[in-house]
Regions:
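Substrate-binding cleft and catalytic face of glycoside hydrolase catalytic domains
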Residues: 25-168, 173-193, 197-199
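A general structural detector for well-ordered alpha-helical segments in enzyme core domains, enriched
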Residues: 19-26, 62-69, 117, 121-124, ...
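Aromatic-rich peripheral "rim/lid" segments of glycoside hydrolase catalytic domains that contact
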Residues: 11, 154-156, 247, 251-258, ...
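Glycoside hydrolase catalytic-domain groove-lining segments
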Residues: 23-24, 170, 185-192, 199, ...
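C-terminal outer-membrane/trafficking sorting elements
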Residues: 358-400
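Structural recognition of alpha->loop->beta junctions
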Residues: 107-108, 115, 119, 123-133, ...
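Boundary/entry segment of secreted carbohydrate-active catalytic domains
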Residues: 1-26
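Conserved, mostly hydrophobic/aromatic
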Residues: 27, 83, 135, 230, ...
Length: 400
């Protein structure tokens, strides 16, 4: 949404109150090295869950928009993650509506349309100087994607719940195969991400013992879906304690050791509760600048213990109504809409991708000795080193 805020005259400042002339440059200087941008098929045809036409100011990212913003990101020397929504509006576990222009297609034709659309979009991005480095083939697709239209009867919708018919899952994986095929053909160096949000065992009833999460990636493996990275959403106010996210990561590391994990959506308020909050974490992390900073620091610390985790993205970090006529309703970005200042959490977030190491050293008898833990070359501590090169007692060691 950054171009919208720039056009509206939003005022951005550092945490110390110095003016920011270029937000992307500021993000990079602070330590961010990648940006994530969503893509809708035709946001002019967006509808509500009742099938009625609506205008959501925030649903505006068509291909031309993404080409322009993606090029800005690449020109800054940052990595670009493209988030295909494969819908005209928001896609998440509660709604995965088929684009209106594709509504009449049967399953085979829909799969072919998905392939051609994905391939063409990527070709246009490349031609515009905005080739993505990472590609999400769908957004929060825990329950499948392109179910049908919001006006369809519930029984007609092709949802993929754990209990859904096998035919629904087959249809879904056939769609994914066409999407990933297009990605490999057009952007062979890009990493493909499968993004879900079943990270909670306490707040998501179908995910006790992470059963829904496990079922999803089991289905992907059975269908031989081609991908590189497991993408997760984690919003503490919806998903519960940090330990729940860590439990999901532990399970994925055990069952899918060949896949990297990224938290592609994360956020926490600096002020009041986000609408629909189901988990109150405020005794530990109050809704304040300090509370937002503290939970971000603790999430980063936890993630850096896991060598299979290689990405952390804040959702909607640039939101800022300061100096505009826009609503200041959203209170979980990395800028305060009352002051325009960057929140303290931004600095903590950037520590995840910093080049500095968390390797500890101790002073014993006047002599410095490295600790006995193993670390990746980026400084992330690992519990049990597997194949690769690690730092141990201040030296590089190769594990075969």
């Amino acid at each position: 949404m950054l171009p919208k805020y720039e056009e509206a005259g939003a005022k951005y400042y550092t945490h110390d109150g110095k003016g920011i002339s270029d937000v992307l440059t500021f993000f990079k200087d602070e330590g961010m090295n990648a940006m994530r941008v969503r893509l809708f098929v035709d946001p002019k045809k967006q509808t509500t869950n009742n099938g009625k036409w609506e205008t959501d100011y925030n649903v505006c990212q068509d291909l031309d928009w993404v080409k322009a913003l993606g090029k800005r990101i690449k020109d800054k020397g940052m990595k670009f993650m493209l988030d295909f929504h494969y819908s005209d509006t928001w896609a998440d576990p509660g709604k995965q509506w088929t684009p209106a222009a594709w509504a009449s297609l049967d399953d085979n034709a829909l799969a072919q349309k998905l392939y051609s659309y994905t391939k063409d979009a990527l070709a246009q991005l490349k031609a515009a100087g905005a080739e993505p480095d990472m590609i999400q083939t769908g957004n929060e697709i825990s329950y499948g994607m392109m179910w049908g239209q919001p006006t369809d009867a519930g029984s007609k919708l092709k949802r993929c719940w754990p209990s859904s018919p096998a035919d629904n899952w087959t249809r879904f994986t056939n769609l994914l195969k066409q999407a990933t095929k297009a990605c490999r053909e057009e952007c062979p160096d890009a990493k493909i991400i499968l993004h879900v949000e079943r990270t909670s065992v306490s707040q998501q009833n179908d995910n006790k013992n992470h059963s829904a999460l496990s079922n999803f990636y089991k289905k992907m493996k059975e269908a031989s879906i081609d991908y590189d990275i497991i993408g997760l959403s984690y919003y503490p106010y919806f998903h519960g304690a940090i330990s729940e996210l860590e439990g999901a990561i532990d399970l994925l590391k055990k069952d899918y050791a060949d896949k990297s994990v990224m938290v592609v959506e994360f956020g926490y308020p600096y002020a009041w509760a986000v609408g629909g909050t189901t988990y109150d974490y405020t005794k530990t992390y109050p809704y304040s600048d300090a509370g937002q900073k503290a939970i971000t620091a603790d999430v980063v610390t936890m993630l850096k213990k896991h060598e299979n985790v290689n990405g952390l993205f804040w959702w909607w970090p640039e939101y800022n109504a300061m100096g505009t006529n826009l609503s200041g309703w959203y209170n979980a970005p990395l800028f305060d809409s009352y002051t325009g200042k960057a929140t303290s959490a931004l600095t903590e977030l950037c520590k995840f991708g910093s080049s500095s190491t968390d390797i500890n050293a101790t002073i014993m008898n006047g002599k410095q000795e490295a600790d006995n833990n193993y670390y990746t070359l980026s400084g992330q501590r690992v519990s049990t080193p597997s194949h690769g090169v690690y730092i141990h007692k201040g030296r590089k060691e190769s594990k075969k």
